[in-house]
């Protein structure tokens, strides 16, 4: 990536980066003596953020020096010299150059410009490690000589090893040849910003240990799915199941379908899964056996296609019914004349029809009461649960579904002295009147 630095400023040793200038040898020598080595003063056509590997290899023959005190200090800490690492150079005059650049690009006030010598090319302490996993990064910065005073204070223009530039999209991760990302603080910046910067030659090699992206590349949880099918010849005690293990649901289902259920030649469609509650009762068709086996394997191959729902189903019919909750479709209308109730599935309509036919197929096993809807039976069962625990039972609301059969074993009204003093005939009249009042409007009944 190339940056245009604007017009020329020969007084501080900066020429136009877009095009090179020609100077006499005397001018160049005089400027080098007075200002120190400035790699951007002459001959460098542009300011490149990350030089390629062949440019780094020839760094000793360019404006960069091969070694300097900054690199020697890093070597004393245990770093080894590699040809790909850039040495240091004198930065006394170049500091004023970068001070101007930060002022010109709008990088902040004078304090920010004064600390710019640690911001553009120096990472925050401990932010980057060397190529061998070292945490001290002084010897592996882009320009290590500028890092000698960076440990004293943090720069506002470097965020966890990121170089901040004064234009849109100004967060750029450092290239891999100057040290890999090891600090977890830099993950918030490096991971989202790395995409779309291919021309910058940013290389984040995955074989250098844990980096900024590895927390987002978690390994899938390994699971073992065991086949518990018992072959008919293995039914004799002790029963021996298949016990083959699989890592994916697809492999388990394929194994059961091919190896155990069989093809069209099988006439008996019996589930031999271990502890199956059907106990050898056959199915009338193979597809029914296949659907039943999903109860044992846990396979649910039919996901809801609506975004954000996430529900999955073992049978396509259940998915079809479920999708009506999203669409609001209710194709099943009550067939009783005068009732305009509609339902999403036929089973709910069938339960509702008991209201009109006065059928009470849902019987209480603890008393003689019966109900037209299973929800009413569930409410009634709470009365028995509370009475068995010794608490005072609350009267159960009839909701139009309670049977008018006189209570025989347990009745909520037995604890009420006023109700218990009534004769059976008056009690029956009371229930009949209640039913006639509730039957005036079918549409108000809860189903």
Swiss-Prot record:
The gene is ZIC1. A zinc finger (C2H2-type) spans 225-260, 269-296, 302-326, 332-356, 362-384. Keywords: Activator, Craniosynostosis, Cytoplasm, Developmental protein, Differentiation, Disease variant, DNA-binding, Intellectual disability, Metal-binding, Neurogenesis, Nucleus, Repeat, Transcription, Transcription regulation, Zinc, Zinc-finger. SMART domains: ZnF_C2H2. One of its GO terms (molecular function) is RNA polymerase II cis-regulatory region sequence-specific DNA binding. InterPro entries: GLI-like, Znf-C2H2_ZIC1-5/GLI1-3-like, Znf_C2H2_sf, Znf_C2H2_type, Znf_ZIC. This is Zinc finger protein ZIC 1. Signal peptide: none annotated. Acts as a transcriptional activator. Involved in neurogenesis. Plays important roles in the early stage of organogenesis of the CNS, as well as during dorsal spinal cord development and maturation of the cerebellum. Involved in the spatial distribution of mossy fiber (MF) neurons within the pontine gray nucleus (PGN). Plays a role in the regulation of MF axon pathway choice. Promotes MF migration towards ipsilaterally-located cerebellar territories. May have a role in shear flow mechanotransduction in osteocytes. Retains nuclear GLI1 and GLI3 in the cytoplasm. Belongs to the GLI C2H2-type zinc-finger protein family. One of its GO terms (biological process) is hippocampus development. Residues 375-431 are annotated as: Disordered. PROSITE patterns: ZINC_FINGER_C2H2_1, ZINC_FINGER_C2H2_2. GO terms for cellular component: cytoplasm; nucleoplasm; nucleus. It is found in: Nucleus; Cytoplasm. It is linked to Craniosynostosis 6: A form of craniosynostosis, a primary abnormality of skull growth involving premature fusion of one or more cranial sutures. The growth velocity of the skull often cannot match that of the developing brain resulting in an abnormal head shape and, in some cases, increased intracranial pressure, which must be treated promptly to avoid permanent neurodevelopmental disability. Structural brain anomalies with impaired intellectual development and craniosynostosis: A disease characterized by microcephaly, agenesis of corpus callosum, abnormal conformation of the ventricles and posterior fossa, hypoplasia of both cerebellar hemispheres, colpocephaly, and partial absence of the cerebellar vermis with fusion of the cerebellar hemispheres. Intellectual development is moderately to severely impaired. Bicoronal synostosis, scoliosis, and tethered cord may be present.
């Amino acid at each position: 990536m190339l940056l245009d630095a604007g017009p020329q400023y020969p007084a501080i040793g900066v020429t136009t980066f877009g095009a090179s200038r020609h100077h006499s040898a005397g001018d160049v020598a005089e400027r080098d003596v007075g200002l120190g080595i400035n790699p951007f003063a002459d001959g460098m056509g542009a300011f490149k953020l990350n030089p390629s590997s062949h440019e780094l290899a020839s760094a000793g023959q360019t404006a960069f020096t091969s070694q300097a005190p900054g690199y020697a200090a890093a070597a004393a800490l245990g770093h080894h010299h590699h040809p790909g690492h850039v040495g240091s150079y004198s930065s006394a005059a170049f500091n004023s150059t970068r001070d101007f650049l930060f002022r010109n690009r709008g990088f902040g006030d004078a304090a920010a410009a004064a600390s710019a010598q640690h911001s553009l090319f120096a990472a925050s302490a401990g932010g980057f490690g060397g190529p061998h996993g070292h945490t001290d990064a002084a010897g592996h910065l882009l320009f290590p000589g500028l890092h000698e005073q960076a440990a004293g204070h943090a720069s506002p223009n470097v965020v966890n090893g990121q170089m901040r530039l004064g234009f849109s999209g100004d967060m750029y991760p450092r290239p891999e040849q100057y040290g890999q990302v090891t600090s977890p603080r830099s993950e918030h910046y490096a991971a989202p910003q790395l995409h779309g910067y291919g021309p910058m030659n940013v290389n984040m090699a995955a074989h250098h240990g844990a980096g900024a992206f590895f927390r987002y590349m978690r390994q899938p949880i390994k699971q073992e799915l065991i086949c518990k099918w018992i072959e008919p010849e293995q039914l004799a005690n002790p029963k021996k199941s298949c016990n083959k293990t699989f890592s994916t649901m697809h492999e388990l289902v394929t194994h059961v379908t091919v190896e155990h259920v069989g093809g069209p030649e099988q006439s008996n469609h019996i589930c031999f899964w271990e502890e199956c509650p059907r106990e050898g009762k056959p199915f009338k068709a193979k597809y029914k056996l296949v659907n039943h086996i999903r109860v044992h394997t846990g396979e649910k191959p039919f996901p809801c296609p609506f975004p954000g729902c996430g529900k999955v189903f073992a049978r396509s019919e259940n998915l079809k019914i479920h999708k009506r909750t999203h669409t609001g479709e209710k194709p099943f209308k009550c067939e009783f004349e005068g009732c305009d109730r509609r339902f999403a599935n036929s089973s709910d309509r069938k339960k509702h029809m008991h209201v009109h036919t006065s059928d009470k197929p849902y019987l209480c096993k603890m008393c003689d009461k019966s109900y037209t809807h299973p929800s009413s039976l569930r409410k009634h069962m709470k009365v028995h649960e509370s009475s068995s625990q010794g608490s005072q039972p609350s009267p159960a609301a009839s909701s139009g579904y309670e049977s008018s059969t006189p209570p025989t074993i347990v009745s909520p009204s037995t604890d009420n002295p006023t109700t218990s003093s009534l004769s059976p005939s008056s009690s029956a009249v009371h229930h009949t009147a209640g039913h006639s009042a509730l039957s005036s409007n079918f549409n108000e009944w809860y189903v």
